Swiss-Prot record:
This is Bifunctional protein GlmU. Homotrimer. NCBIfam families: glmU, PRK09451.1. PROSITE patterns: HEXAPEP_TRANSFERASES. It is an enzyme of class 2 (transferase). It catalyses: alpha-D-glucosamine 1-phosphate + acetyl-CoA = N-acetyl-alpha-D-glucosamine 1-phosphate + CoA + H(+); N-acetyl-alpha-D-glucosamine 1-phosphate + UTP + H(+) = UDP-N-acetyl-alpha-D-glucosamine + diphosphate. In the N-terminal section; belongs to the N-acetylglucosamine-1-phosphate uridyltransferase family. In the C-terminal section; belongs to the transferase hexapeptide repeat family. The gene is glmU. Pathway: Nucleotide-sugar biosynthesis; UDP-N-acetyl-alpha-D-glucosamine biosynthesis; N-acetyl-alpha-D-glucosamine 1-phosphate from alpha-D-glucosamine 6-phosphate (route II): step 2/2; Nucleotide-sugar biosynthesis; UDP-N-acetyl-alpha-D-glucosamine biosynthesis; UDP-N-acetyl-alpha-D-glucosamine from N-acetyl-alpha-D-glucosamine 1-phosphate: step 1/1; Bacterial outer membrane biogenesis; LPS lipid A biosynthesis. Acetyl-CoA binds at residues 380, 386-387, 405, 423, 440.
Length: 456
C-alpha cells in the first residue's frame, strides 16, 4: 500500500456524439448533478491534493458549470486517445505522488472501491480496476501469465484467443507520478485506431518487472460508462434504486421505491412516509413523522416534525416549522416560511413571505413579500399586490387578523392586530389595530331588468 499523496486525473474531453446534444457529454445530469461532478466529488472525498480535469469539447460550458477551487484545467485540443489525454496532464504530476485516473462519463464509481484500489497499489507498480463480463465484446482484455497481469489488449487489436478472455479493463488505474510520466513518454499510436492507449503502460510495467494488481469493484454499475441517453437513463435508475434501498433500511417508508427520485441529500427523522412520484432535490431535511403526498417536489427545504404535504405541491427553498400542512397543489417559492401549525391550502403561492403560528391561507391566494402574524385567516382569492412594475414592496399583517375573500393588499401597507377586512376590499392605506375595513362599490338593484336579446 502506498502512503504517498495522491492527485486525480479526470478525462472529460469527449464530445459525446451519440448523445445527440449540444451539451458536452459529461455535463448531462444524473440525479440532478452533472456526471463529471459525481466524479469530482468522489475525488474530493478521497482527499486528492489536486484534480486535473482534461477537457476539450465544450470547454466554455464546462468552466461555466464547474466551480471547484482545486480543479486544474488541462486542454486536450485533439482527442487522440486516453494515453494522449494523460500526456497533456503529465507535466502537472509530482514524482512522489500517486496518480489516479478516472472518467467524467463513469459517474457511479464509489469512494470505497477507489480506496481499495489505492490500498492495493504495489510500491512501484500499478493498481488496476477490472471486471469479468459474460459478453466482453468491445472491451480491452486483461492478459495474464501464471495469474499475473501482463497487459491489456484492445478488442480491435485482440486475437481470437484473446477475445475469449472475460476479464476486461475498466480504464481506472493508479500509479506513481514518476513511473507514469516515464511510461507515458514511451507511448506510440501503432495500433488499429491510430491512438495513444493508456493501456499500453501495463505491458511496459510488466516488462520492467513491476507488479500489477487487479481489483474488482463492488458493483458493475460503478464502472459503467455513458455513451448515449439510454445508458444514462439506466444508470439513473440504478442510482435511484440504491438511494431508495438505503432510505428504506434506515426507516423511511417509500410507498413505491421505483417511483422516487433523490437528486441531492436527505436528512430525515423517524416514521417519515413518502408516497409515489416524489422528487427531492438539493439539500432536504424532513423531521419526525413527516408525510409527503404523491407527486410532490421538494427542493432545498427544511420540513419540521409532524408536517404533512399533500399531493402535487412544490416546495423550494422554504422553511416549515412543526405541524404545518401544505396543499394539495400548493407552491412555496424561495423565502417562504411557515411557523408552527400554519396551513397553506390548494392553489396558494408564497414567495419571500412568512405565515405566523396557526395562521391559514386556505385556497387561491398569492402572498409575496409579506410578514403575516399569528392566528390570521387569509380568505380565498386574497392577493398581496407587491410589484408596482419596477420595485417590490412589503405587506405586514399583525396577529388575529381576518382577511375576507377577494381582498387586494396594495403594498407597501401595514395591517394592525385584530383587524377585520371585509370581502372584496382593496386595501391601499395602513390599518390601525382592531378596525373593520371595507371598500365596495354600492350594490345597485334594478327591478324588472331584462337581459339583452340576441339579434338575428
Amino acid at each position: 500500500m502506498s502512503n504517498s499523496a495522491m492527485s486525480v486525473v479526470i478525462l472529460a474531453a469527449g464530445k459525446g456524439t451519440r448523445m445527440y446534444s449540444d451539451l458536452p457529454k459529461v455535463l448531462h445530469t444524473l440525479a440532478g448533478k452533472p456526471m463529471v461532478q459525481h466524479v469530482i466529488d468522489a475525488a474530493n472525498d478521497l482527499g486528492a491534493c489536486a484534480v486535473h480535469l482534461v477537457y476539450g469539447h465544450g470547454g466554455d460550458l464546462l468552466r461555466q458549470t464547474l466551480h471547484e477551487d482545486n480543479l486544474n484545467w488541462v486542454l486536450q485540443a485533439e482527442q487522440l486517445g486516453t494515453g494522449h489525454a494523460m500526456q497533456q496532464a503529465a507535466p502537472f504530476f509530482n514524482d512522489d505522488e500517486d496518480i489516479l485516473m478516472l472518467y467524467g462519463d463513469v459517474p457511479l464509481i464509489s469512494v470505497e472501491t477507489l480506496q481499495r484500489l489505492r490500498a492495493a497499489k504495489p510500491l512501484g507498480g500499478i493498481g488496476l480496476l477490472t471486471v469479468k463480463l459474460d459478453n466482453p465484446t468491445g472491451y480491452g482484455r486483461i492478459t495474464r501469465e501464471n495469474d499475473q497481469v501482463t497487459g491489456i489488449v484492445e478488442h480491435k487489436d485482440a486475437s481470437e484467443a484473446q477475445r475469449q478472455i472475460q476479464e476486461i479493463n475498466t480504464g481506472i488505474l493508479i500509479a506513481g507520478g514518476a513511473d507514469l510520466k516515464r511510461w507515458l513518454a514511451k507511448l506510440t499510436n501503432n495500433n488499429a485506431q491510430g491512438e495513444y492507449y493508456i493501456t499500453d503502460i501495463i505491458a511496459m510495467a510488466y516488462q520492467e518487472g513491476r507488479e500489477i494488481v487487479a481489483v474488482h469493484p463492488q458493483r458493475l454499475s460503478e464502472v459503467e460508462g455513458v455513451n448515449n441517453r439510454l445508458q444514462l437513463a439506466r444508470l439513473e435508475r440504478v442510482y435511484q434504486a440504491e438511494q431508495a434501498e438505503k432510505l428504506l433500511l434506515a426507516g423511511v417508508m417509500l410507498r413505491d421505491p421505483a417511483r422516487f427520485d433523490l437528486r441531492g441529500t436527505l436528512q430525515h427523522g423517524r416514521d417519515v412516509e413518502i408516497d409515489t412520484n416524489v422528487i427531492l432535490e438539493g439539500n432536504v431535511v424532513l423531521g419526525d413523522r413527516v408525510k409527503i403526498g404523491a407527486g410532490c417536489v421538494i427542493k432545498n427545504s427544511t420540513i419540521g416534525d409532524d408536517c404533512e404535504i399533500s399531493p402535487y405541491s412544490v416546495v423550494e427553498d422554504a422553511q416549515l416549522q412543526a405541524a404545518c400542512t401544505i396543499g394539495p397543489f400548493a407552491r412555496l417559492r424561495p423565502g417562504a416560511e411557515l411557523l408552527e401549525g400554519a396551513h397553506v391550502g390548494n392553489f396558494v403561492e408564497m414567495k419571500k413571505a412568512r405565515l405566523g403560528k396557526g395562521s391559514k391561507a386556505g385556497h387561491l391566494t398569492y402572498l409575496g413579500d409579506a410578514e403575516i402574524g399569528d392566528n390570521v385567516n387569509i380568505g380565498a382569492g386574497t392577493i398581496t399586490c407587491n410589484y408596482d412594475g419596477a420595485n417590490k414592496h412589503k405587506t405586514i399583517i399583525g396577529d388575529d387578523v381576518f382577511v375576507g375573500s377577494d381582498t387586494q393588499l396594495v403594498a407597501p401597507v401595514t395591517v394592525g392586530n385584530g383587524v377585520t377586512i371585509a370581502a372584496g376590499t382593496t386595501v391601499t392605506r395602513n390599518i390601525a389595530d382592531n378596525e373593520l375595513v371595507l371598500s365596495r362599490v354600492p350594490q345597485v338593484h334594478k327591478q324588472g331588468w331584462q337581459r339583452p336579446v340576441k339579434k338575428k
